[in-house]
Amino acid sequence: MPAERPAGSGGSEAPAMVEQLDTAVITPAMLEEEEQLEAAGLERERKMLEKARMSWDRESTEIRYRRLQHLLEKSNIYSKFLLTKMEQQQLEEQKKKEKLERKKESLKVKKGKNSIDASEEKPVMRKKRGREDESYNISEVMSKEEILSVAKKNKKENEDENSSSTNLCVEDLQKNKDSNSIIKDRLSETVRQNTKFFFDPVRKCNGQPVPFQQPKHFTGGVMRWYQVEGMEWLRMLWENGINGILADEMGLGKTVQCIATIALMIQRGVPGPFLVCGPLSTLPNWMAEFKRFTPDIPTMLYHGTQEERQKLVRNIYKRKGTLQIHPVVITSFEIAMRDRNALQHCYWKYLIVDEGHRIKNMKCRLIRELKRFNADNKLLLTGTPLQNNLSELWSLLNFLLPDVFDDLKSFESWFDITSLSETAEDIIAKEREQNVLHMLHQILTPFLLRRLKSDVALEVPPKREVVVYAPLSKKQEIFYTAIVNRTIANMFGSSEKETIELSPTGRPKRRTRKSINYSKIDDFPNELEKLISQIQPEVDRERAVVEVNIPVESEVNLKLQNIMMLLRKCCNHPYLIEYPIDPVTQEFKIDEELVTNSGKFLILDRMLPELKKRGHKVLLFSQMTSMLDILMDYCHLRDFNFSRLDGSMSYSEREKNMHSFNTDPEVFIFLVSTRAGGLGINLTAADTVIIYDSDWNPQSDLQAQDRCHRIGQTKPVVVYRLVTANTIDQKIVERAAAKRKLEKLIIHKNHFKGGQSGLNLSKNFLDPKELMELLKSRDYEREIKGSREKVISDKDLELLLDRSDLIDQMNASGPIKEKMGIFKILENSEDSSPECLF
């Protein structure tokens, strides 16, 4: 039975609730309050998210910084270890030299004393080597005082040697807080002390004295002092089981240093085998250099058919030659990847990867295959350790030292300068606060050796690079605008109107509807040859009609899938898109329009005749072989004698053309494909380089320049880079300049030399002023303004071609000051007079 509620309680509440519900409405104040609460909630949530994001960024930054410090500590361990070993070895070498000198002095003194005694007393019979006479008495030869003095000296020497080595370790342990830059300076100084350049008193090569450190099996030449230093650096890495990168500038003899290192290893009793892996085009040079400098060391060119390579594999394990050692195996990247299963079972004493920047992509097959090779030591040879971004440099370091360089994201996030959107002042402030670039220099110190031509004071004339901005011609402007607007196809398709065939009903016929006489086809259509023979006459008749009906006025090369390539072709020459054809001869139309339709050709047409008149020889590089074809037409038009080199030519043709250019004074221009002629050729007969179109990778153009700016060049070299202003051509150059800036910051020209070379020992960090100069450096020193009608005036042309200051500098034998000059051609109105600003 339910409990009874108190009287009067329920009756009074129910009417009140009903009344409240009847009168409840949503007022504007309530709506405003709801909106305010919602806005406050969103603001509170936004602040929480912002706080969480800032906290996460701070924590992630701290985590990455700790990883960076850990990487630096690991690199410090290598540096300190190398330094300790090198200083110990230096002390041991010094002790050995002192002992030899004392022994020589004692022999001289003893010889003089014996000669005096011989004149007064009877001659003393010499004793045989060994311990045959047990009654041998030392007192017969030396007095008691001499014995005691020698024993005392030996005891003191042993104590000094032990204490010095102990003190070295204690000193090294006490200096754990040393920065890697100080270690680098000590390391460099130790290398210099170990390689003091003095000549062997006995050995000579072609009448010239040989450096004392040059290996005895290196008999084909005399090593330069910086090559001896490089060999000593490689020796230190090899003796301590550390891999490295030899990144000397092109033309300094990286191949010679490697050959000398292998000869030194053989001299130390290492029988091999050794493996050299590189591009196919470099293999003949490796074989020739080994034969030239170390003829006693056996080599093997591992190439050929599969059966031939199977026989060669068995010969790797056989000892050959007068030295009875395993051969130096030289092979290409492709063969190394294909025969990895056979080659990876060999225990290579030394693995050299030539053109090491080929493994800049850590995901490529080549780096995966090479990592499986069993090698005691690995060495990468590259003149361009940093080409595009830091991930490429990290890929090289990861291949050599996977235990040290194992975190790409942290490495790249800290050091990728191209990802920074801050101004130069912000970058400098960040560098002052965190010293990131300084840390990177410290980390790379033990593993990278890079010297420039200016560092080693070679007899190489100065070089200047000049960038010339060319305008667009009227035809180029039309094509360029049409390509950007994607209407270029209409320009060539509108004139070719297709004849429309109508059906009996008045509608256009479908293209697939063709009258076919099936009675001519047998009942067995599987006979394919018979079917083709029956249809072919009809196809030939249709083709003949098409060829007659369409007049050939020009050759059109239009591929709309790659707009960027079309824009580049338009900047180079509009004939790459549409080359006019002479209607009479049906050959390419070569006349003055070939020059006037391209802004770059207008520049060339002003420069080349004057260069020829002054006795210069020109290398003209282009990325496109089709562009070389048009340049050949221009040379025929102006009666310029020329040679050519591209990737499609055979080895004999290349040799013939290079010999012709280097020896024949009448050959004025050498047309070269940048990629085909960028490596392995010597064209020092030229003193002028013209880069017609720049590469996205600035190192490709630098390699091209070094074909003539190298050892053996006797004249100053000027490099002209042609750029079409305000186009994709200029964007490519600017992008390449950004990559060069990254290289200048990371692979600093005052670091990784293997010597101090004027470095301040107390300078531990990058100078902010120096960093600002790198970030805000101007790439030009002159501007020339002119109208389109006259691209370059006579006065400006004289400034452009003048190299008298370089000649004076070379004759004075003063320090070569690197300069960058740009002649910038700007479009002005016709009434504006040319102006020259300095």
Swiss-Prot record:
GO terms for biological process: apoptotic process; cell division; cellular response to leukemia inhibitory factor; chromosomal DNA methylation maintenance following DNA replication; DNA methylation-dependent constitutive heterochromatin formation; kidney development; lymphocyte proliferation; negative regulation of gene expression via chromosomal CpG island methylation. Belongs to the SNF2/RAD54 helicase family. Induction: By concanavalin-A in peripheral blood leukocytes. The modification Phosphoserine is found at residues 115, 503, 515. This is Lymphoid-specific helicase. A motif (DEAH box) lies at residues 354-357. One of its GO terms (molecular function) is hydrolase activity. It comes from Homo sapiens (Human). Keywords: ATP-binding, Cell cycle, Cell division, Coiled coil, Developmental protein, Disease variant, Helicase, Hydrolase, Mitosis, Nucleotide-binding, Nucleus, Phosphoprotein, Transcription, Transcription regulation. ATP binds at residues 248-255. It is found in: Nucleus. One of its GO terms (cellular component) is chromosome, centromeric region. It holds the Pfam family SNF2-rel_dom. It is linked to Immunodeficiency-centromeric instability-facial anomalies syndrome 4: A rare disorder characterized by a variable immunodeficiency resulting in recurrent infections, facial anomalies, and branching of chromosomes 1, 9, and 16. Other variable symptoms include growth retardation, failure to thrive, and psychomotor retardation. Laboratory studies show limited hypomethylation of DNA in a small fraction of the genome in some, but not all, patients. Residues 235-403 form the Helicase ATP-binding domain. Residues 94-108, 119-134 have a biased composition (Basic and acidic residues). Its EC number is 3.6.4.-. PROSITE patterns: HELICASE_ATP_BIND_1 (PS51192), HELICASE_CTER (PS51194). Residues 603-767 form the Helicase C-terminal domain. Residues 30-115 form a coiled coil. The gene is HELLS.
